[in-house]
Every structure is written in structure tokens, then in C-alpha cells.
Amino acid sequence: PLQSPEETIDEIHDNAGIAIAAHPYCYYRSGLGNITQSLDVDAMETKNSRYILGISNYLSKKVSNKNNIPEIGASDAHFVEGIGCCYTEIPVTDSVDTLLKYIKKGKSTAHGKRTPMDLIIREVIRKKGHRTKPKEN
């Protein structure tokens, strides 16, 4: 069932997960925008490699810094070639629990670059093709 952001975050925390606001200022991908600032998120994606101008990354980084919300980076890859364009640097550990604690404590840093434009265009064309197919009854 569809849940509110608050309910989703509560469920994540109830299951020992960390709640990360993914591309919060990317409005064409359902980012939560300024609502993120009032949510109990554990981290915010401040570097997402699938962008055109980078405004959403800039705003995410600004809000993350202003509100002391830990940052992460993610490739958000839809093609193999896009994997690793953005990433999160975290101190080395063998423990998943420690890794999650590092993120929550802000010991993570987002790095990376934009996905190559030809991959972004290929994805847009692929999605457009799916949307134009007639619905089957």
C-alpha cells in the first residue's frame, strides 16, 4: 500500500534500516523537495549521476550541509556503463552495522560525476518507447 514519507521512514527504522532521501530536489523523479528537511531521514543523496544541469545535486548538498544531514552519492544506474559514476566514500569496515552507523554519523562523503549523456539519452528514448505502446485490455 502507498505510505506517507513518515510512515515509510518509520517502517525502515523498525526494520533496522537507514532512511535515505534519494534525489530529493529532482522534481521530475518525484523528489520530496523541502519536505525532506522536516523528515527523520538518516542521510540525503547529494550526488546523483543522472542529471542534466546539476541543480538538484546543488540544492541537495546545500540543504544537507545546512541541516547537518549526512550525505551519500549514488549512480542510480539504469545501464551497466553507468555503475560507479557516483559513489559514497565510507571508512573501511567488515561490519554492515558499523557501515550503517558511519553513514548515520555523517562519516560518508559523496563523490562522482555525471552519467555520460549518451546513456541518459538512451534511457529517455527507452522510457519514451514504453509510454507510447498501446495499453493491452
What are these model-predicted stretches?
Residues 6-10, 18, 27-137:
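Charged catalytic cores and adjacent phosphate/nucleic-acid-binding surfaces used
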